[in-house]
């Protein structure tokens, strides 16, 4: 099958990465022929229904279980032997580069995977390779570029920027045709690393499906309870302990509040224990991971959406959380941490920003919205207008589609995407 763009991501399909799924569908809808590759299959029990809309098959670079290891190992060894025989000087030069830079084990794994991927994308007729993250996937795509001279690009989001080696990231930027970033904060971080290659770094927000995520068709019956919603993986950077602490303060103040948390992750039991120790277990529900349709319905039951994100010691952080955009598109007022890319989305008209890691500040903001229901309604309406104007998925995808047009090349259209 002749294709134009080999699209590589870390895991596919992953429930929490709807932005990757949406981008793939959007590019295919825009007429960009894609061939999907993923380093691994997440093998999650729950799969987004829209995965069925993806036209391209998916090839996995990592073995799919013990029985597949021998096949993957043999094809990987054969691929590297073929690449060495095809151009010994090029191949040994890359090996020397890896040894000289003293890269760790993950780099060797990336190189091994890249050898197999190089022959796969060549056989598929790819003219360009794009990686969906700046760390592992971009490293694999970079090695494909070095092994084959195929042009490549990558997207940088949040964690993948801040946990990467700056020197290695600078080399990947230098050799890339372009780099996409989804927030100004990510753009600034990448351009600082890029130095003289900063012009390659482009600002291209993900966007959200404003038709799927829309306001409730009929008003919900009002009562005295403030319904708070948070959607996201239960991991440290999401700041869930801050949210639980804020709920405890609201309850102590005598306010009627009910909090729903949608998402799964390693902090689930710890958060439940925290809620119990603070005496707010009856006020907090953990629903686990949900498919898109159920998540969209959950926004219709919310008065306020909370994004209590924090920056971790290793630099890991959110960019612009997709759930935040979904809530705003659904016409829900938002309260979020003033950190990373979040302030780029929330204007004073559509939400409240609070200091990260501060349960008291979050509680104060929620108390204000509890006491002023009219303000919640105004903010929700403004939030939807803002997302439609600036973060509509279709418009965002159409902005980057020319970068992947096989007839026009990949560098000239980049000038039409924002650089700041």
Task: List the predicted regions and their residue ranges.
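Nucleotide-activated donor-binding/catalytic signature segment of Leloir-type glycosyltransferases, i.e.
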Residues: 272-293
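A short, well-ordered alpha-helix in the C-terminal region of glycosyltransferases
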Residues: 283, 361, 368, 375-390, ...
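Acidic donor-binding loop of glycosyltransferase active sites
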Residues: 300-315, 332
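Short hydrophobic beta-strand element within catalytic cores of glycosyltransferases
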Residues: 324, 329, 333-336
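Conserved acidic donor-binding segment of nucleotide-sugar-dependent glycosyltransferases
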Residues: 348-359, 368-374
């Amino acid at each position: 099958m002749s294709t134009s763009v080999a699209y590589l991501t870390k895991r596919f399909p992953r429930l929490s990465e709807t932005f990757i799924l949406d981008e793939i569908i959007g590019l295919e809808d825009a007429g960009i022929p894609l061939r999907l590759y993923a380093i691994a299959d997440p093998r999650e029990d729950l799969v987004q229904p829209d995965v069925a809309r993806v036209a391209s098959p998916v090839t996995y670079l990592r073995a799919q279980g013990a029985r597949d290891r021998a096949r993957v190992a043999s094809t990987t060894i054969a691929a590297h032997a073929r690449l060495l025989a095809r151009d010994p000087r090029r191949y040994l030069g890359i090996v020397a580069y890896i040894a000289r830079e003293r890269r760790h084990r993950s780099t060797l794994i990336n190189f091994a995977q890249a050898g197999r991927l190089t022959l796969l994308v060549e056989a598929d007729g790819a003219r360009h390779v794009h990686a969906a993250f700046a760390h592992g996937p971009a490293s694999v795509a970079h090695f494909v570029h070095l092994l084959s001279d195929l042009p490549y690009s990558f997207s940088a989001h949040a964690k993948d920027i801040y946990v990467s080696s700056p020197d290695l990231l600078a080399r990947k930027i230098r050799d890339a045709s372009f780099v996409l970033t989804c927030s100004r904060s990510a753009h600034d971080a990448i351009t600082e690393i890029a130095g003289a290659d900063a012009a390659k770094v482009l600002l291209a927000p993900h966007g959200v499906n404003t038709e799927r995520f829309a306001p409730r068709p009929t008003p919900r019956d009002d009562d005295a309870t403030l319904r708070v919603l948070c959607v996201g993986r239960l991991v440290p950077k999401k700041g869930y302990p801050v949210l639980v602490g804020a709920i405890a303060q609201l309850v102590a103040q005598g306010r009627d509040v009910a909090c729903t948390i949608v998402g799964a992750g390693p902090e689930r039991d710890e958060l439940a224990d925290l809620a119990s120790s603070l005496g707010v277990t009856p006020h907090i529900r953990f629903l686990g991971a949900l498919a898109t349709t159920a998540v969209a319905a959950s926004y219709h039951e919310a008065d306020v959406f909370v994004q209590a994100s924090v920056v971790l010691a290793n630099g890991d952080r959110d960019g612009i959380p997709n759930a935040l955009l979904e809530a705003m598109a659904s016409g829900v007022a938002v309260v979020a941490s003033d950190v990373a890319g979040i302030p780029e989305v929330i204007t004073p008209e559509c939400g409240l920003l609070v200091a990260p890691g501060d349960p008291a500040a979050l509680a104060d903001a929620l108390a204000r919205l509890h006491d002023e229901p009219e303000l919640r309604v105004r903010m929700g309406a403004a939030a939807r207008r803002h997302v439609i104007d600036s973060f509509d998925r279709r418009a965002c995808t159409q902005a980057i589609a020319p970068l992947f047009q096989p007839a026009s090349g990949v560098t000239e259209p980049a000038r039409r995407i924002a650089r700041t």
